[in-house]
UniProtKB/Swiss-Prot annotation:
One of its GO terms (biological process) is viral process. Bet binds to human APOBEC3F and APOBEC3G. Bet interacts with host APOBEC3C; this interaction does not induce APOBEC3C degradation, but prevents dimerization and incorporation into virion of the latter. One of its GO terms (cellular component) is extracellular region. This is Protein Bet. Pfam families: Foamy_BEL (PF03274). Residues 10-23 have a biased composition (Polar residues). Bet counteracts the innate antiretroviral activity of APOBEC3 family defense factors by inhibiting their incorporation into virions. May be implicated in the establishment and/or maintenance of viral persistance. Bet is required for viral replication. It comes from the Viruses. InterPro entries: Foamy_BEL. Keywords: Host cytoplasm, Host nucleus, Host-virus interaction, Secreted. Residues 1-52 are annotated as: Disordered.
Length: 482
């Protein structure tokens, strides 16, 4: 693993008492309350009336940090995990150039995407508040604080289950290859993966490698075979899972930040290639398995989601769009987590169905090239060196094929109870059941019945009840509330 020239521990939080919470980085002291604030700037000409435009309205989200801390007064406070920006700057943290930061992973850098609502174009990945990467919970692309707190909250939940195996975040002052000083910490968060956080004076960098998992993604062969991408573990470093996010701005900045999304490939720094098989076994020592039995959302993400999204043969805009579809489906259920909340979804079956084929398809490629709704004319669907671009059968570009519209994604063995209930309602007629191996039964709640499922007497009663023409048949067996 890479090591820098100088390392100095500055944030061993066991001896620090007066640390602020992350809420003080992005909002007032009464964290937990949300408000809409207008960014007011000094008027150059006081005679001209002040006009507020849509871009001048800054929406800042506050999360209940103190409420979470008050629920567990016997444990370490969340505020004891992060040093303050003033403390980091006091350690002579320096400014850095964006080009220098990108040059550290230039050999494994697959794409760079500039995010932010002020950028030109109508790319949905740019206009969205959600970071367009497949992650267990939505992350923010507007500010580093909600993203950092979501990761910290998830790590803290694991600490509450087994305090003896978790340590507080320890930030160290280091020097990068260009000679600039920065603050850094690194830890493993299941099921997300290995997380590295770096603080410069004018940048905050988050690097995540989802291929590092000593419990769900360890290879049992030799060390030489482990470095072979063709015979490695189930999930390897790919642009669809491994990423680096660069937030541009001061550490104490409260306004929205400019963001750069870098997708990383095989062999990137602070990734799975830096860990040998003995290192992964060492990470397991003294730790309890964070994954439960089948039906656990964390287990489902570690196996089903990562295996179903590991292919990185598509272009970066396509991966961004598919990731947004993934998070859009999760956030459509209001009981699932939002930005800044490090909780797992109830299930990822619907999100995987919205993500679509991980290696792409002819139908999706034709739709992508015809609609051009991503704001980039001439953008490719497959990245260079990806899948075969030839597609002999060209379907209608404005709709999916009959097979895509009428089939249901098969149910995975890692599906959660929420996924099984949703799949049963979508795939089976009303009243039909699915009985699992453990004896739990799930009944279909479908409220719409097609004519292919009705007898002549039922059709006649439907006609007498005043419904429309009963002989209008959609021809689909997937009609339902979803």
């Amino acid at each position: 693993m890479d090591s820098y020239e100088k390392e100095e521990s500055v944030a061993s939080t066991s001896g620090i008492q007066d640390l602020q919470t992350l809420s003080e980085l992005v909002g007032p002291e009464n964290a937990g309350e949300g408000e809409l604030t207008i960014a007011e700037e000094p008027e150059e000409n006081p005679r001209r009336p002040r006009r507020y435009t849509k871009r001048e309205v800054k929406c800042v989200s506050y999360h209940a940090y103190k409420e979470i801390e008050d629920k567990h007064p016997q444990h370490i406070k969340l505020q004891d995990w992060i040093p303050t920006p003033e403390e980091m700057i006091a350690q002579k943290v320096q400014n850095q150039d964006l080009g220098t930061i990108l040059s550290f992973d230039v050999t494994c850098l697959k794409s760079i995407t500039s995010l932010g609502r002020n950028d030109p174009g109508d790319d949905p990945s740019i206009m969205s508040h959600v970071l367009p990467v497949v992650t267990p919970w939505p992350m923010s692309q507007d500010h580093y604080a909600p993203t950092l707190f979501g990761i910290l909250d998830r790590y803290y939940q694991g600490y509450l289950k087994s305090p003896a195996t978790y340590q507080t975040w320890k930030f160290t002052c280091q020097v990068d290859p260009s000679g600039k000083r920065f603050m850094e910490t690194q830890f493993w968060v299941p099921p997300l993966g290995q997380v590295n956080i770096q603080f410069y004076k004018n940048y905050q960098i988050l690097t995540c490698c989802q291929a590092v998992d000593p419990f769900a993604n360890i290879f049992h062969g030799t060390d030489e075979e482990m470095f072979d991408i063709d015979s490695g573990p189930d999930v390897w470093c790919s642009p669809s899972l491994c990423f680096k996010v660069i937030y541009e701005g001061a550490m104490g900045q409260k306004q929205e930040q400019k963001t750069w999304l870098c997708r990383l490939g095989h062999g990137h720094r602070m990734g799975a290639c830096d860990y040998r098989k003995v290192d992964l076994y060492a990470m397991r020592q003294g730790k309890e398995n964070p994954y439960g039995d089948r039906g656990d959302a964390a287990l489902q993400y570690a196996y089903q989601v990562k295996r179903g999204c590991k292919a990185g043969c598509l272009a970066s805009p396509v991966l961004n769009y598919k990731a947004l579809q993934f998070h859009r489906t999760i956030m459509a259920d209001f009981t699932n987590p939002r930005i800044g909340e490090g909780h797992l979804a109830h299930g990822y079956q619907a999100a995987m169905e919205a993500y679509g084929p991980q290696r792409g398809s002819n139908e999706e490629r034709v739709w992508w090239n015809v609609t051009r709704n991503q704001g980039k004319q001439g953008g490719e669907y497959y990245r260079e060196g990806g899948e075969e671009p030839h597609y002999p059968n060209t379907p209608a570009p404005h709709r999916r094929t009959w097979d895509e519209r009428h089939k249901v994604l098969k149910l995975s063995s890692f599906a959660t109870p929420s996924d099984i209930q949703r799949w049963t309602t979508k795939a089976l007629p009303y009243g039909w059941k699915v009985v699992t191996e453990s004896g739990n039964d799930y009944t279909s709640r479908r409220k719409i019945r097609t004519l292919t499922e009705m007898t002549q007497d039922e059709i006649r009663k439907r006609w007498e009840s005043g419904y429309c023409d009963p002989f209008i048949d959609s021809g689909s067996d997937s009609d339902g509330p979803f």
